[in-house]
A protein has these predicted regions:
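Transmembrane helix segments
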Residues: 34-44, 174-235
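Junction motif at the cytosolic side of a transmembrane helix
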Residues: 242-300
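Hydrophobic alpha-helical transmembrane segments of multi-pass membrane transport/permease proteins
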Residues: 14-48, 67-85, 126-129, 187-195, ...
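Aromatic- and glycine-rich beta-strand/loop motifs that create alpha-glucan
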Residues: 1-32, 97, 112, 297-299
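Alpha-helical transmembrane segments and their short interhelical loops
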Residues: 110, 118-198
């Protein structure tokens, strides 16, 4: 275990030493929250107000708080996954510059080497996304704060789950890559497409029934819904406190993807947590077996 920790610390130091990669990873959440607030806030607001009956009046603070919670939840859902591809660059760099050849003739097993890559990816991703979370809390405080301490802790738990999910996924995808250009191309594709697939850019409830059914098989759907449920929990509690009709509140929950459906059944929060834990375990097992395969420059 001491060897694994030493490898993890070595990878983390390389991440901090590469100022370009560090700056890119740290600035990504800032850019995302600016883009989300600029281009998606109005879309989210229109989607939310469309579910409110004309005879019911909701304060601007509650509307802004709802939109901000949805926006920040979407940002965190995307950031926790895409950032892992940025910080996982060390695995590919070691193959590109020949460092893996030195590791391969050392007494350290390939399993420990790849576990070190994985743990450093998790640690660095948590650090970057912690910054994103602080920015999100500041945005919520400005727009409309309805979270309590328990909600914040649940969101932190969600963030850890999503980072673990993203780290296993990025480790599997990055394993066969041997150049930084390949990883950059993969990162670009993931950054561009993941937000649509997981329902961050546009609620899945706005898609056609066929696409909704297809996306219900992906764990990313439940990852986004999970963090939305905890981010919006205080908002829904405020609506109940003000005695808004239950039908309206449920319609809003459906519109915001807080009630994902699988084969006609609504998936609950505990089930979403189970899906994410199961996905992490499955991808972790796949990563383990993948690392046993020869990979050219990096194989043993």
């Amino acid at each position: 275990m001491r060897t694994v920790l030493a490898l993890m610390n070595r990878n983390r130091k390389l991440f901090f030493k590469d100022k370009g990669m560090l700056f890119t990873s740290m600035i990504t959440p800032v850019i995302l929250i600016v883009l989300y607030a600029t281009f998606l806030a109005k879309v989210f607001r229109d989607s939310f107000t469309a579910a409110i009956p004309d005879m019911i009046t909701i304060s601007d603070k509650l509307i802004n708080g709802t939109v901000a919670a949805q926006l920040t939840a979407s940002l965190m859902a995307v950031s926790c996954i895409t950032v892992t591809f940025c910080v996982n660059l060390t695995m590919v760099q070691d193959k590109a510059n020949g460092t893996r050849k030195d590791f391969n003739v050392s007494p350290v097993s390939s399993g420990k080497i790849y576990l070190g890559y994985f743990l450093s990816t998790v640690a660095n991703s948590l650090m970057v996304n912690a910054l994103a979370f602080v920015l999100c809390l500041g945005y919520l405080l400005k727009m409309g704060w309805y979270l309590n301490a328990v909600d914040v802790l649940w969101v932190l738990f969600d963030m850890i789950l999503l980072v673990l999910f993203g780290s296993t996924l990025s480790s599997i995808i990055s394993f066969p890559l041997t150049t930084q250009g390949q990883l950059s191309a993969v990162g670009t594709i993931v950054s561009a497409g993941y937000g649509f697939i997981c329902g961050a850019y546009m609620p899945i409830s706005n898609f056609g029934s066929g696409l909704q059914k297809a996306l219900s098989y992906l764990p990313s759907t439940y990852a986004t819904s999970l963090i939305k449920n905890h981010m919006l929990h205080g908002v829904f509690m405020e609506m109940e406190r003000k005695n808004y009709p239950d039908e309206m509140v449920e319609a809003i929950r459906d519109t915001l993807d807080c009630n994902p459906v699988f084969h006609g059944n609504v998936v609950g929060v505990n089930q979403m947590i189970g899906i994410m834990m199961g996905s992490i375990a499955v991808f972790g097992i796949i990563y383990y077996f993948v690392t046993l395969l020869p990979d050219g420059e990096g194989g043993r």
